[in-house]
């Protein structure tokens, strides 16, 4: 992809590859602080990130690990919520059993939130926002409000990427079927296909 998009600009390709090497050589993230688990249903758990204010159930994407919202003390959405007087409770999907989206919401997410037995706000990131909306509809008055962060809502906006996505899936589906899962290494190119120029620009900086 990078060589294709930079075919007419060797200097830009060199900059992109240099940026990619810097990314690959970056030091690993610091060890994460283990958070207490306050609820669990199957593979889905709630982790308490502290704070004494109103509870906010934070729902990450199914694709990213939960700690993407708590990368480091100085780079943490959850630490920011605590600093603002809230009590963030992070949903950790764990190694999710082979459930459909409807089952995951109705049999895992909704019961683990309902078990708190008190009104909560929901904050959903990316696909987690879509799941938060469904959970809020099922939980009714227990949910006081919903905040959505980077949640997809206009799926008609990717017409230019559809041929690339169709080609990616035609090559990926047989392997995913054989594995029984879709590993992130196979899924990542689908995200790249949505904005190839943006991926190149990120590494060219």
Spans of features found by a protein language model:
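Alpha/beta-hydrolase-fold enzymes
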Residues: 1, 117, 133-205
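N-terminal targeting or regulatory segments adjacent to alpha/beta-hydrolase or S9 domains
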Residues: 1-29
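A structural boundary/capping signal
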Residues: 3-4, 49, 102, 120, ...
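Short, surface-exposed "cap/lid" segments of acyl-processing enzymes
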Residues: 26-94
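A structural signal for isolated positions on well-ordered beta-strands in alpha/beta enzyme cores
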Residues: 89, 121, 145-147
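The conserved SAM/SAH-binding core of class I Rossmann-like methyltransferase domains
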Residues: 91, 125, 149
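Catalytic nucleophile-loop/oxyanion-hole region of alpha/beta-hydrolase
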Residues: 94-119
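Gly/Ala-rich beta-loop-alpha elbow adjacent to hydrolase catalytic centers
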Residues: 123-128, 132
């Amino acid at each position: 992809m990078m060589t294709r998009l930079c075919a007419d600009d060797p200097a830009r390709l060199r900059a992109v590859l240099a940026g990619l090497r810097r990314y690959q050589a970056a030091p690993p993230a610091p060890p994460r602080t283990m958070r207490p688990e306050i609820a669990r249903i199957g593979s889905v758990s709630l982790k308490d990130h502290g704070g004494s204010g109103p509870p906010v159930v934070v729902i990450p994407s199914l694709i990213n690990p939960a700690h993407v919202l708590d990368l480091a003390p100085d780079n943490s959405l959850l630490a920011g919520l605590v600093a603002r007087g809230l009590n963030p409770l992070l949903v950790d999907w764990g190694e999710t059993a082979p459930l459909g989206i409807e089952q995951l919401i109705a049999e895992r997410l909704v019961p683990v939130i309902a078990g708190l037995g008190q009104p909560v706000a929901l904050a959903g990131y990316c696909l987690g926002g879509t799941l938060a909306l469904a959970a809020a509809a099922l939980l009714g008055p227990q949910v006081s409000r919903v905040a959505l962060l980077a949640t997809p809502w206009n799926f008609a906006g990717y017409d230019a990427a559809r041929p690339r996505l169709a080609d990616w899936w035609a090559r990926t589906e047989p392997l995913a079927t054989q594995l029984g899962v879709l590993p992130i290494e196979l899924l990542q190119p689908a995200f790249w296909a949505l904005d190839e120029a943006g991926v190149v620009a990120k590494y060219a900086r």
